[in-house]
């Protein structure tokens, strides 16, 4: 989820400490609605945040393992193989995010390579992983 929960909580504290009642009841009511929505999103993220990141990282690594044998660029192939062999050492969100960001940067590199080299099957596999990632991160406000 972006922004991350610490950012949402800090913003909430700023809103509450900033004297929202000074601007009138309508403004305060709007701010409280916004804060309530942010807290609901934070609760949902808290519940599923680690699971989403672990699944994404696993899917990306599996994709790299599948793509690497077809890559002719030696440097990219080595990066894909190294990333595919990696694993998440911690379930801390900050550590999972760091791994996820690094994997996503390499995924972008792999996608550019696939597009530049007409590797349509690789492109389709990449898009399937991206679609699954987007579906996992979808946030619904209802129950």
Language model: regions and residue ranges:
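Intrinsic-disorder-associated interaction segments
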Residues: 9, 53-56, 69, 85, ...
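Amphipathic alpha-helical binding modules
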Residues: 93-143
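N-terminal interaction modules that seed assembly of large macromolecular complexes
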Residues: 6-62
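Surface-exposed polar/charged interaction patches
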Residues: 15, 19, 45, 66-70, ...
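Short, surface-exposed, charged/polar-biased interaction segments
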Residues: 29, 33, 37, 56-63, ...
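Histone-fold modules and their flanking histone-like tails across chromatin and transcription assemblies
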Residues: 1-3
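Aromatic-anchored, charged helix-turn/loop surface patch used as a conserved interaction hotspot
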Residues: 42-89
């Amino acid at each position: 989820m972006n922004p991350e929960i610490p950012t949402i909580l800090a913003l909430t504290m700023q809103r509450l400490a900033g004297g929202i009642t000074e601007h009138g009841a309508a403004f305060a009511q709007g701010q409280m609605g916004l804060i309530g929505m942010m807290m609901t999103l934070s609760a949902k993220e808290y519940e599923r945040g680690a699971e989403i990141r672990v699944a994404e990282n696993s899917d990306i690594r599996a994709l790299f393992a599948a793509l690497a044998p077809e890559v002719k660029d030696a440097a990219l192939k080595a990066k894909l193989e190294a990333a595919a062999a990696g694993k998440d050492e911690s379930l801390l969100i900050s550590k999972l995010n760091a791994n996820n960001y690094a994997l996503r940067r390499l995924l972008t590199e792999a996608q550019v390579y696939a597009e530049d080299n007409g590797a349509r099957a690789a492109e389709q596999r990449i898009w399937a992983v991206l679609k699954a990632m987007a579906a996992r991160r979808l946030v619904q406000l209802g129950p």
